[in-house]
Curated annotation (Swiss-Prot):
Keyword flag Disulfide bond: no
Disulfide partners: none
Catalytic residue positions: D67
Native organism: Streptomyces griseus subsp. griseus (strain JCM 4626 / CBS 651.72 / NBRC 13350 / KCC S-0626 / ISP 5235)
Encoding gene per record: rnz
Residues reported in the UniProt entry to bind Zn(2+) 2: D67, H68, D205, H263
Keyword Nuclease: yes
PANTHER family recorded: ZINC PHOSPHODIESTERASE ELAC PROTEIN 1
Domain of life: Bacteria
Names of the cofactor(s): Zn(2+)
Protein name: Ribonuclease Z
Positions bound to Zn(2+) 1: H63, H65, H142, D205
Oligomeric and partner information: Homodimer.
Lineage start: Bacteria, Bacillati, Actinomycetota, Actinomycetes, Kitasatosporales
Length: 304
């Protein structure tokens, strides 16, 4: 059975707290796992969340500030220690290549796994295209070079049993119609409907910019930083971050179905205020104020 869910490993921003670890998010997408922004302590959080090194197929780092990347050293060494049986691909800003190398080879260990380096440069663009999804990136606005990521499942078609019966199509003929697009004068479009592929977006440290909206547009799930509350918007702009209200307005204007707020400044004690401000900004879809070690299902597909 396919599983599509977000496993939240950490939700703090620059400074971890007693209740919030540095960043870390594993997206389970059917049989594949994509680890985003492994901050300090990610390896232990994986253990607590029931995530194994074998679950990781791809690593995506938005930028090289410590709360988003210090966990790379431990995670990479654990992947090799456990002799993960498949290659792992790492995406990260090309401008931070020297940081990646330092973290990859922070200490001595035996390399047993193929780790493919696929850095992101320029405006971003398509990073990977598989039968299951396309992975894109877009440049964000932060004091150091930062990229967000977007995963898009290909659109497919859903066969409609009533229309198949109406045209007398059954058994092996259904497969032939799906393969060839036409059968006995009946086209695939006549007996099916488009099923839109699911879309997932991951947006960390950034001010509002075109890249934020490009990544968020039409997402079934948007995981987005909301470091500050609205009353501290000036701080957010100065330091290259978003407020809860700004993140929620992006989600509202982009047609996001499920908004996941995370990356909270340690200055705030009550996470419910982030939800209050997000609702006040007009977002009325599913909303999760992330906590460490929770699992958030990707919304089920909906038909047009």
């Amino acid at each position: 059975m396919s599983v599509r869910e977000l496993v939240v490993l950490g939700t703090a921003s620059q400074v971890p707290t007693r209740h919030r670890n540095h960043n870390g998010y594993l997206l389970r997408w059917d049989g594949e796992g994509i680890l985003f922004d492994p901050g300090e302590g990610t390896q232990r959080q994986m253990l607590r969340a029931g995530v194994a090194a074998h679950d990781i197929h791809r690593i995506c780092v938005t930028h090289f500030h410590g709360d988003h990347s210090l966990g790379l050293a431990g995670v990479i060494q654990r992947i090799n220690l456990d002799q993960v049986p498949h290659p792992v691909t790492a995406h990260y800003p090309a401008s931070g290549q020297h940081f990646f190398e330092r973290l990859r080879y922070a200490t001595a260990y035996r390399e047993t796994v193929e780790l493919n380096q696929a850095p992101v440069a320029g405006a971003g663009g398509v990073l990977a295209a598989t039968p299951a999804y396309t992975l894109d990136s877009a440049k964000l606005s932060h004091p150091v070079e930062s990229y967000g990521y977007r995963l898009t499942e290909p659109d497919t078609r859903r066969m409609l049993p009533a229309l198949l019966r109406e045209h007398g199509i059954a058994g092996p003929d259904v497969g032939r119609l799906q393969r060839d697009g036409v059968l006995g004068g009946v086209t695939l479009e006549q007996v099916s409907e488009e099923r839109r592929g699911q879309r997932f977006a991951f947006v960390m440290d950034t001010r509002l910019c075109d890249g934020v909206y490009a990544l968020a547009e039409g997402s079934d799930m948007l995981v987005i930083e909301s470091t500050f509350l609205d009353e501290d918007e000036k701080l957010a702009v100065d330091h290259g971050h978003l407020t809860a209200g700004q993140a929620a307005r992006v989600a509202r204007e982009s047609g996001v179905r499920h908004l996941v707020l995370t990356h909270f400044s340690q200055r705030y004690g009550d996470p419910e205020i982030f939800e209050t401000q997000a609702r006040a900004a007009g977002f009325d879809g599913e909303l999760t104020v992330a906590q460490d070690l929770i699992r958030v299902p990707v919304p089920t597909r909906h038909h047009p």
